[in-house]
């Protein structure tokens, strides 16, 4: 007998050699029916996995993240089975689960139409109704290659596996797929499925490879859950910054300008200007000094920093080292430039910390499949900065940086929407990271200790660090459920030495400083996208590009409307007047669609009494009030940065 420690701490004795599913059956038939996978000794395992020793075990149902992934992973195989039934000539690529669903990539002659997606969905339902058993089996490499000989992408995946790796397959009826799992015991629990869309995707995410057809879908154990999800998806589409931002005239794109290069229109530029002025003033108040550095540098600079070795593929390089005496690259970051400023003068320990800040235009050569609206672009604006400090100052400076980020998030009204991720290196990925295990271990321990001292609730993620050190990532989910990093705070253990940076300590000795890479608001474009989605375009008054719109009832009141505009502008309010010869109801509706915080209607009565008739986004129609009172009210709201 072996002892199984369950999630609630209770211990159950079972025979050795039982599968996770059989252990679930011994606990409860209901639990077994709803089981999707298990977490055995901290690792997600298939329900068929055999347990031979004392272990901790959690049975995962659809209510857990792990259970949902196994559930949707199985649904992706059902989709692949349906494709092979209806389009047997199509070739299989990969079909993982993702947050809120799954996708599968196929090599097909043409992308799937809406009609074909409907047919595939119906075929999936037929397969589920047939309820074939799901079987798992393993094969030696030569037999696996023979089984998959007609599936070139599967053959490539098998050949990519290291020698000695387990090669496993899952079978649903007569459909067999190469897969590591985990999967459900049967397809019957999939009661509701929906194929959402088809897009293009490069094999292995590399645009040098063939473009495949990717089908996205989602699945649930209850139809009511699917209906609720689809309803939420429709709401998300309404908030999608890529759609709403264009409708509101915040940004646009042009194919002749290029992908990943959005054009900020006057409204979008005004929003970013507002945020930038606020951030620069706040950073100055907190002791930062401003720098202004070039948009490009010689390759020599990036070779010193290590970016040339670890990040060259993500850079825009100007020139050819084999032909040109000097090769330049557009900067993907600001750090080496600010290090050059630091090195231009000698520093005593009394001069530290030095806090550099810069509103930096940066360039990154993102692949076409990665780019999306304002969230992932090739040119962006970052509230960048670097703190050079002594080891004794590191914790306080890190704490102050986190404090600034929290202040910014609270002021923007999104403090409750963010999560913290401690991103660490992967010691097996020496191409991506500086290979100094001792320094990595030491720096990661320092950061973990600081985060614990600050009582920050964080998760840990391997292989997500910067190449020169660990980082704290502030994460935000977009309307589609995808998690994006909006701000990072990094501890750098390597670049001070590479750039020969030092300070003179109290004994007159040269010492290496610590460096904190940080941002206060992140990439302005990404933050703008996040705010559009958070507020469904109805940005807080202090951020809104147009804070008030004045609507005269007719041309007779144009002069008074202009007088109202002038007074508001004099007090720093962003205001416009709508003098078009349209009916007032039409102009009010249009101003509402533009998410204007305040609509001010002026006619004969308002002109005579020096009033404005106020319609606010928050309270609706408020009636007439003295112009002076309204001006004071909106100025105070803007000054307080109310959300």
Swiss-Prot record:
Keyword Cytoplasm (UniProt): yes
Locations listed in the record: Cytoplasm
Binding site for Zn(2+): 335, 386, 517
Top-level EC class as recorded in UniProt: ligase
GO cellular component: cytoplasm
Family, as annotated: Belongs to the class-II aminoacyl-tRNA synthetase family.
Subunit and interaction comment: Homodimer.
Name of this protein: Threonine--tRNA ligase
Source species: Clostridium perfringens (strain SM101 / Type A)
Gene name in the database record: thrS
